[in-house]
């Protein structure tokens, strides 16, 4: 039997939750009718009753605020691996990350089936230098199991003051025992575009992730390559391996640089602002010179937008391994009290109308995970063509004529 005092406590919690739901209804009042459904008052009462039971009967004292925060987290995290409720510290962390630099180990992660999975280590980061790979599962941080209910907690534990160390234990397919990495945190600066001339006429552009400046940085890199070559490029290797994604607009800008026309990406969601189609504008930075795009399991999100746009528009061949398969768009929505909710608001589709979510994009030319030829190891100071077998194969593909042996074939003809 519930006593009078417990009834009062239950009433108080019910009122608090009722006020919150009422405010939510007010917020939704100017939204489309599809979003203005009846609020689940019966479920709200059940929530209040459970909270009251926990407060009264749980073995240890509990904090109302922490209980409600946990309830909110559980609600949002149950949606998909990429949606999350962000408290003040976590929201600040998101803003720091988007600024282009932070102190940490440089790993892009996602939550999948209650496991923290490495999407990709950022190029040049402590994690990349130590050998952490896309697909690794982070099991422990400093010997303590990761919190599989809060991705933000895991990210926060990996970040810290520059120069400090953190021990990360990972599970890797093919390894019987967990692998241990001791990493020294450093300043992670997101320089997203690097370029070099592989040989006369053949350019190489590496995009490590997509930031707000990536489009402009690509334009500058291509101009520099043309200047160093002394003429227009005859082919380009676009390296998107282990690129975890980033800013959607940057991916559209990169795709548009190589397309004369056609759809780049289409997004579909429930609200008008979450539905859009991005189309290419006239002008091809390479004037039709062929492109090979290198991809692997660490190529995700915005990187997959570029790969899909160039492949489906018959502008490039993909070489490597199937991409990660993150075909969704997240929007960070600020809340009162310097908090926010990160929600998946759209699914995006390649120009052919295919959603790559959870399936990825298969390459035109598949390469094994270890593409290095047998023989003595190559010095890190050696030219890229000597130390990266996949880049070498991409250049070979760029040189292969497909019509009558003339070699003077347009990209559209070669890649259909």
Please name every model-derived segment.
Residues 31-43, 47, 52-64, 117-120, ...:
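Cleft-lining beta-strand/loop regions that shape enzyme active-site pockets
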Residues 58-119, 163-167, 171-182, 189-192, ...:
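Extended, small/polar residue-biased N-terminal targeting/export presequences
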Residues 337-346:
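Short acidic, Pro/Gly- and aromatic-enriched capping/linker segments at domain boundaries
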Residues 135-137, 354:
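Structural motif
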Residues 2-83, 116, 414-416:
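Terminal targeting/pro-maturation regions of precursor/exported proteins
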Residues 340, 352-416:
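Conserved functional hotspot residues or short segments at active or partner-binding sites
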């Amino acid at each position: 039997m519930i006593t009078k005092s417990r009834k009062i406590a239950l009433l108080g919690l019910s009122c608090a939750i009722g006020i919150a739901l009422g405010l939510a209804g007010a917020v939704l009042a100017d939204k489309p009718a599809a979003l203005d459904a009846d609020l689940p008052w019966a479920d709200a009462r059940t929530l209040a009753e459970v909270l009251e039971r926990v407060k009264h009967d749980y073995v240890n004292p509990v904090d109302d605020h922490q209980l409600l925060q946990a309830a909110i987290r559980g609600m949002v995290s149950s949606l998909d691996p990429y949606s999350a409720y962000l408290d003040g510290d976590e929201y600040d962390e998101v803003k720091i990350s988007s600024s282009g630099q932070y102190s940490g180990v440089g790993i892009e992660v996602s939550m999948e089936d209650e496991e923290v999975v490495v999407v990709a280590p950022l190029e040049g980061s402590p994690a990349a230098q130590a050998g952490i790979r896309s697909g690794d599962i982070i099991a422990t941080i400093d010997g303590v199991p990761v919190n599989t209910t809060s991705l933000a907690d895991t990210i926060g534990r990996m970040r810290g003051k520059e120069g400090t160390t953190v021990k990360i234990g990972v599970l890797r397919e093919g390894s019987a025992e967990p692998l241990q990495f001791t990493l020294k945190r450093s300043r992670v600066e997101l320089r997203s575009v690097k370029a070099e001339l592989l040989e006369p006429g053949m350019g190489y552009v590496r995009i490590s992730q997509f930031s707000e400046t990536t489009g402009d940085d690509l334009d500058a890199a291509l101009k520099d390559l043309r200047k160093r070559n002394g003429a227009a490029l005859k082919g380009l290797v676009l390296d998107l391996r282990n690129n975890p994604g980033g800013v959607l607009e940057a991916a559209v800008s990169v795709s548009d640089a190589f397309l004369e026309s056609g759809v780049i990406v289409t997004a579909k969601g429930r609200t008008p602002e979450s539905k859009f189609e991005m189309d290419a504008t006239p002008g091809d930075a390479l004037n039709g010179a062929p492109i090979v795009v290198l991809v692997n399991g660490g190529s995700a999100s915005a990187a997959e937008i570029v790969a899909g746009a160039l492949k489906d528009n018959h502008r490039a061949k993909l070489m490597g391994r199937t991409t990660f398969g993150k075909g969704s768009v997240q929007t960070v929505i600020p809340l009162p009290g310097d908090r926010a909710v990160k929600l998946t608001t759209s699914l995006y589709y390649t120009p052919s109308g295919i959603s790559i979510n959870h399936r990825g994009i298969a390459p035109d030319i598949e390469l094994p995970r270890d593409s290095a030829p047998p023989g003595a190891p190559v010095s890190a100071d050696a030219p890229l063509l000597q130390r990266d077998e996949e880049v070498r194969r991409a250049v070979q593909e760029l040189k292969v004529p497909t019509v009558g042996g003339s070699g003077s074939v347009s990209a559209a003809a070669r890649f259909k």
